[in-house]
């Protein structure tokens, strides 16, 4: 299907003989060529999939490309705005130390991009649900696996809302370091869209979710820090705090996580 600005599903591995499809969804600030190649995702699940399986990255407008920091214009919003942001960042560092202070103060620099990415979510969730609908229409036996990291988990949640209305099912879903709310009212109804389970991998060591996400969203229940609160028996919450020490470690440690907790 045609998607705006070449966003949408990008094939990483296609096969006409496969009934299994894996779709990866990256998070905030992932609009960069290395992220689109999805080498980390592919390496992480390699032992648990067949060589003939189809693999796609869902490329979406996820906000600021971090490579654009090279051309960042510090006073583009005026000197007072820049001073205010710098003052808050400095105060956070003084109060909480360098690492935690930066994570608490830096959201001021990302706020516009974060809002843009969140606003884009429903549009791209519509696109992803249409892509999945097309796959299932072409091959009802196609087992579709979804993998999401960070804000990509929220895009998957919005996609599930669409699939629920269309009565479309996928096979399984894996969420890592989720930048998404864990309220039961949002998850219970849509949990059975993923027929054989939604696996939520979280870590109490995820400072990005703990400080940056919670400041941006004012949400005390992100699924990247704690369990999804749910009455559904189709959602499995798995604490990986003893394996994952930070937000960017999830994709590097998928093999370790799957080896211990799950086999596709």
Predicted regions span which residues?
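C-terminal catalytic-base region of ester-bond hydrolases, centering on the histidine
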Residues: 209-264
């Amino acid at each position: 299907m045609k998607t705006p600005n070449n966003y949408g599903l990008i094939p990483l591995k296609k096969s006409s003989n496969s009934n299994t499809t894996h779709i990866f969804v990256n998070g905030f600030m992932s609009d960069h060529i290395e992220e689109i190649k999805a080498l980390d995702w592919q390496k992480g699940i390699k032992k648990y999939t067949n060589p003939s399986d189809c693999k796609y990255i869902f490329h979406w407008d996820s906000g600021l490309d971090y490579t654009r920091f090279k051309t960042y214009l510090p006073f583009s919003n005026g000197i007072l705005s820049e001073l205010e942001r710098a003052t808050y960042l400095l105060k956070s560092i003084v109060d909480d130390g360098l690492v935690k202070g930066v994570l608490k103060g830096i959201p001021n620099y990302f706020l516009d991009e974060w809002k843009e990415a969140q606003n884009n979510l429903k549009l791209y969730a519509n696109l992803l649900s249409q892509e999945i609908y097309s796959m299932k229409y072409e091959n009802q036996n196609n087992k579709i696996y979804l993998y999401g990291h960070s804000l990509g988990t929220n895009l998957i949640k919005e996609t599930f809302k669409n699939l629920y209305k269309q009565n479309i099912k996928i096979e399984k879903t894996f969420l890592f370091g989720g930048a998404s709310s864990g309220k039961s009212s949002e998850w219970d109804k849509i949990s059975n869209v993923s027929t054989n389970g939604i696996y939520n991998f979280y870590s109490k060591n995820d400072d990005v979710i703990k400080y940056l996400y919670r400041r941006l969203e004012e949400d005390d229940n992100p699924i990247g820090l704690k369990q999804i609160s749910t009455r559904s028996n189709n959602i499995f919450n798995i604490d990986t705090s003893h394996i994952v020490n930070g937000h960017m470690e999830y994709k590097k440690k998928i093999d370790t996580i799957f080896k211990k907790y799950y086999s596709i």
